[in-house]
A protein has these predicted regions:
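Long amphipathic alpha-helical coiled-coil segments
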Residues: 67-79, 113-138, 184
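Amphipathic alpha-helical coiled-coil segments
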Residues: 53-65, 106-127, 173-174
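Short linker/helix segments within small regulatory modules
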Residues: 218-227
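Short Cys/His-rich local motifs and their 1-3 flanking residues in nucleic-acid-associated proteins
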Residues: 209, 232-235
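Short, charge-rich amphipathic alpha-helices with coiled-coil/heptad character
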Residues: 1-5, 19-59, 85, 132-148
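Short cysteine-rich clusters marking metal-coordination/redox-active sites
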Residues: 204, 230-233
Length: 246
């Protein structure tokens, strides 16, 4: 294939644009801001899970406090009833002994329940404190997520803008290229990754492999408008303007 030297050099500009588009795509897929956002989101979710577990624990201990308070209240009412009977003077000696024994049992039961209630209330206080601290931590992490989200979105927007600029530049360059030369370039780019490279110091600018003397001689003997290919990577070899042709 033959193509004007200027056309061939346009391929180098196009290859530069395509390389930048590849870099932008890679950057978009590996954004540090995305990783920071993912980490912040994971931490927030873990904190929210811990907050949920503490909320359940707090509900459970509240229910236990309510149950114990009800039991203590029931024992006290029973004690009040027994004392009222004792004070009434209407019970016989057998009933009196039974009431006194029951009162002793009830007083012991009340003391035990109050001790248990005190322990549970202390546990409730501890869990409530942990819950409040965890809620504050979760809220702080939520704010971190929003900051990370904004940074991620700004970085993504910057990449999108840069990609749009490169796409526009590519459209401009391809509009000035011969259709057959562009098709050859695009076909190589799809199959080999890099469509064209500058021949410099005996090396292919696409694959960076040094060419042997025989290949260099063949290239030197070729006409300026001859479209050359790298024997290693098959990229289009573009010769420097100052050394093009014989």
């Amino acid at each position: 294939m033959k193509s004007d030297v200027a056309q061939q050099h346009l391929l180098l500009k196009l290859a530069g644009v395509d390389a930048e588009l590849v870099r932008l795509t890679h950057r978009a897929a590996h954004l540090p801001e995305q990783q920071a956002y993912d980490q912040a989101l994971a931490e927030e979710r873990a904190a929210t899970d811990r907050l949920g577990a503490l909320a359940v624990a707090l509900d459970d201990v509240e229910a236990e406090v309510t149950r114990l308070e009800a039991e203590v209240d029931a024992v006290r009412r029973r004690e009040d009833r027994d004392r009222s009977l004792l004070d009434s003077g209407t019970v016989n000696p057998k009933q009196l002994a039974e009431l006194q024994h029951e009162l002793t049992t009830l007083e012991r039961r009340q003391a035990d329940l109050e001790d248990i209630l005190l322990e549970v209330m202390e546990r409730r206080e501890q869990i409530a404190g942990d819950h409040a601290a965890q809620r504050a931590a979760a809220e702080a992490l939520g704010r971190d997520v929003e900051v990370a989200r904004q940074a991620r979105d700004e970085a993504s927007a910057g990449i999108d803008q840069a990609r749009a600029e490169q796409d526009a530049r590519r459209t401009e360059l391809t509009a000035g290229l011969d259709a057959d030369l562009l098709a050859l370039y695009d076909g190589q780019r799809v199959s080999g990754g890099i469509g064209a490279g500058l021949l410099q110091a005996g090396r292919c600018g696409a694959c960076r492999i040094e060419l042997d003397r025989g290949e260099i001689g063949r290239i030197a003997a070729a006409s300026d408008d001859e479209v050359l290919r790298c024997p290693e990577c098959r990229a289009i070899l573009v010769r420097p303007l100052k050394t093009a042709g014989r």
